Amino acid sequence: MAVQRAASPRRPPAPLWPRLLLPLLLLLLPAPSEGLGHSAELAFAVEPSDDVAVPGQPIVLDCRVEGTPPVRITWRKNGVELPESTHSTLLANGSLMIRHFRLEPGGSPSDEGDYECVAQNRFGLVVSRKARIQAATMSDFHVHPQATVGEEGGVARFQCQIHGLPKPLITWEKNRVPIDTDNERYTLLPKGVLQITGLRAEDGGIFHCVASNIASIRISHGARLTVSGSGSGAYKEPAILVGPENLTLTVHQTAVLECVATGNPRPIVSWSRLDGRPIGVEGIQVLGTGNLIISDVTVQHSGVYVCAANRPGTRVRRTAQGRLVVQAPAEFVQHPQSISRPAGTTAMFTCQAQGEPPPHVTWLKNGQVLGPGGHVRLKNNNSTLTISGIGPEDEAIYQCVAENSAGSSQASARLTVLWAEGLPGPPRNVRAVSVSSTEVRVSWSEPLANTKEIIGYVLHIRKAADPPELEYQEAVSKSTFQHLVSDLEPSTAYSFYIKAYTPRGASSASVPTLASTLGEAPAPPPLSVRVLGSSSLQLLWEPWPRLAQHEGGFKLFYRPASKTSFTGPILLPGTVSSYNLSQLDPTAVYEVKLLAYNQHGDGNATVRFVSLRGASERTALSPPCDCRKEEAANQTSTTGIVIGIHIGVTCIIFCVLFLLFGQRGRVLLCKDVENQLSPPQGPRSQRDPGILALNGARRGQRGQLGRDEKRVDMKELEQLFPPASAAGQPDPRPTQDPAAPAPCEETQLSVLPLQGCGLMEGKTTEAKTTEATAPCAGLAAAPPPPDGGPGLLSEGQASRPAAARVTQPAHSEQ
């Protein structure tokens, strides 16, 4: 739907000199320094890491800090500072020792949790990454090995599953004796799987799974392996008994993708990636008869792996697949850098981290989470921290913490605020008063002290509902204590505060003040009208959802142009963008009005006229186009198709010859019509007063007419849109020779312009000649209108209807 977007009334541009003065004020400030003794920055040399502790045993959490002494080190557990006690001891190097690790069920004190090392000196405070400390445990087996029967020469598989911290080491016993791991027919997988290939009678026995870690040792139930007689002579289709599982690992771990295949003859097992990329050879090995082992996995190893079992010498194959996801803990691509800035200026820190999944970035100020608000802004997924109008309270150590499901990392930087002596205080008595719907006047008093060196003021402006990063500034002369802020939005609350600037720096900010602009009625909405049928119209416009916020919407009126009163108002919400009118008089010309309203009243209306005679789908007052060319093209195309289907090739040739002999007469006639339309040489004539009568009063006279009482000159409408009843009346115009070629048809027009304009006015001689020949020649062949209206124009009648052919008149306001 090609409807133009509603444009708010144009505001006068804001004065240029405040924008030019602001950079001049900033140039007079002292140049910033990029660092003050970075060698003395407070930072961690060693941070605590995740660990598993044995209940009742001691554990040490490492932490070493570098920085300007004295440095105070404390520890937090789950975000709460640990008090000094005999249960835990702070070592001289900053590490924490827990003497007897506790794991008490049922809500009793436990030492499990997330630990952080906190270091502080006179410049600020930093917090280490979180280290998760868990107790070593061992559960019972939740999957025991099952009894298995295998054929001699075949494959047997046992599996057990158990949870524990740290991850248990799985070994196997046969008849209570550890199996021989040097036997190449026995394959032990780390996830608790035992595979035996090439089964023999001596492989039979009872197998146990043994799990062990620092917490405990567990032995599973026994499972018997029975080896039956050889069935090697029988053919068996290849089959995959066990395929690869979906795995999620962290970088540098080992991936084990299992694939156990059977068949006779023994199938060949191969591996590939579903995406077609090569698996590679570095760190890759095949364990047993088909298990894929990837050592030291990286993010690039992520993907879907396909195990295929092929019968030798044939294309018979079976496949199974599993997905490997490799995660990478967060690490920094760009660390924040320590900076120093003059008071009143802007400080910016940048911190970029990468990982898989992408890490989330959080900022800390002296160990406390820092969120956006006030003069603090976070952009680019929190990777950029901006602090505007810095003051002494902003001097601190800022940390960037990047964290994902695979791990976390932190980096810190220090902000030093250069505060010169003799800076002025904040401006006083700041007031903001609404002047109009787009202007607010802000006034203030100069600071109490140190005013002699003031070189200007900077006014900070933003919508009260907007985030701080959308704030903008305007500079004001030092001798001015008020400023008119223009180009604002109606019915909108704004926040204002001011700073005084000297060559040494800026003052602190004044107390913010709020003011709302006055409201106004909305602008006229753009309106398009489409003829859907002989008695229906479709009205199209752009929705304005904001009207609903101001108790507003749209009002729709319509009437036959011959009537005095309108039907309406039809009230529509601001979110609606179309409306259909039906059961209309197919012989009438309709006037349609659409206006927007809010709590401040009704806006100006957009008016459209449209005729339903000879109804076909048309667009009223559509964007500029050469309608005569379009109609001629459509008629030529349609005629060609109908003739080609119903008459045949012979009739096509006949019609072409007929058109060739008739074209010359039509061109000559249209040239005569165009000469009648062309204005005389010399000064341009005034617009036809009859056309102006159709459009109502001029701009200066609009206020004298009632909005709903204005009527259209019906004599003019009858000439432009003759009623259907006129078909039976004698035509007072000169008769047209039936043998003469038909000029442009009057009833082809369905659009009435709202402002006077001449068809040929302002056109070059070449353009006139072009429009007077080919387009008109095409229209001359148009059939008479079905409603019985006049179908032909004489040369003397072409002047006024031709002026009504313009399809893009200038918009008028009701």
From Swiss-Prot:
The keyword RNA-binding does not apply. It comes from the Eukaryota. Residues 36-139, 140-220, 238-321, 329-416 form the Ig-like C2-type domain. GO terms for cellular component: membrane. Keywords: Disulfide bond, Glycoprotein, Immunoglobulin domain, Membrane, Repeat, Signal, Transmembrane, Transmembrane helix. Residues 770-781 have a biased composition (Low complexity). It is a single-pass membrane protein. It is found in: Membrane. Pfam families: fn3, I-set, Ig_3. Disulfide bonds join C63-C117, C160-C209, C259-C307, C351-C400. Residues 722-743, 762-814 are annotated as: Disordered. Residues 426-520, 523-618 form the Fibronectin type-III domain. The keyword Signal applies. Belongs to the immunoglobulin superfamily. DCC family. This is Immunoglobulin superfamily DCC subclass member 3. The gene is IGDCC3.
